[in-house]
Each structure stands twice: as C-alpha cells, then as structure tokens.
Amino acid sequence: VLPEERLATAAHWTAKSLEIAEYFEDARMTSYVLRMHGNELRKANLRGAAVQRLCRAAATAPDDTARAAALPLLARAAGALGNSALFDRVMRETEGLLDSVDHTSLFNPFSLHEIRLRGLVSTGRTRVAMQLVENSPVPTTVVAPQWRVIELVTVAHVQLLADDRTGAARSLDIAIREAVTQRLPHQLQRITRTAGTRLPTQHSTASQLLDRIRREMAA
C-alpha cells in the first residue's frame, strides 16, 4: 500500500526482521520473513536480490503450505528479472500444489493468472499473454481485494500491447476507482505508467488522485 518512493524503507526494515528471525532458528518464521523481504526487494526493483531471498524462502519452507506461500512471490520476481526458465519452473511447481494446499489471498488460480500474464510479458512472450488475457478465473472470496486491482492493471497492459485501447481504458477506469477506494498509491503509479501517452484521460485521472493520496499521507 506504500507509494514507490517509500518502498526502499520497507525493504530495509524487513531486512532487519530477517536478522531477528534467523536468530531463533525457526524454519517457518525464517521462510516467512525471507518471502516478505524478498517481495519488498522486488517492489524496490532490486530484482536479483529478490530472487535470491525468495529462492531461500522456498528452500527453507518446512512444508508444502509454506512453500506455496513463497513460490508465487518467487515467480513474480523471476519474471521481473526476465529469467524465463526459472519463471516457468516455479509456475509449474506452484500450479501443481493448487489441488493439495489450501488457497490463500496470494496462492489461488486468480492471482496466479495475473502472475503468469505479467511474467510472460516480462520474459518476452507477449503473444502468449495476449492469448491468455481474457481467460482470467473468477475471483473467489479468498482473493484479497487489492489483487483485483493488480490484475486489472496487468490486463490493461496486455490489452494495450494488443492495441485494444478501448478494453485497456475500461480496465484502467475500474482499477482507478478500486485503487482509490482501497488507498493503493502504488497501483495508481502502475496505472499512470501503463496509461502513458496512449490513454491520457486515465493517466491524468490517476495522477491527480495519486497526488491527493500523497497529500493525505503527508498531513
């Protein structure tokens, strides 16, 4: 929920938490903190370090439940890094656990669909992403509300790559409303980048609302 300019702070403090977790030599706790720290590193664009921490989180996980919590984050980081081989391997393993591990706000078919779309684009397989973009699973109650916003922005990005400006504008309009309701400045920043110069109305609206949230956070 932090704007991008504050993400480095989150990465710093989760690193401090890792030092504490490792002291207790508890595999589950260490895996949890590693995945939180790795995810913050990814959001701060420290992608190589993120993949390293998230690989450790998956390796440290004491059971399939803990591993299923780490793997989606590792897939996101591997995709962002452009490592297609690691991304594909982790996605296969993650999807292989869907029938045997309870679903969570991150580990579920809806969230994994978004992760796959984004990873395919990041690893140079835009055409495959275009073929999958309309096949999003129906979100269930286990899906966290912010994941709907995350997915809408990713879908809009793929729609623009397919030159579907009407569909992308519709996706971003919904994402903007939800991002404001849920107070998600980072997603508004993603929206402005996605809209760019091709969707000036959505870019302007998201920018204005982002400025408003920043002022409220600074008050």
Where are these regions (language model features)?
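Conserved binding/catalytic microenvironments
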Residues: 1-219
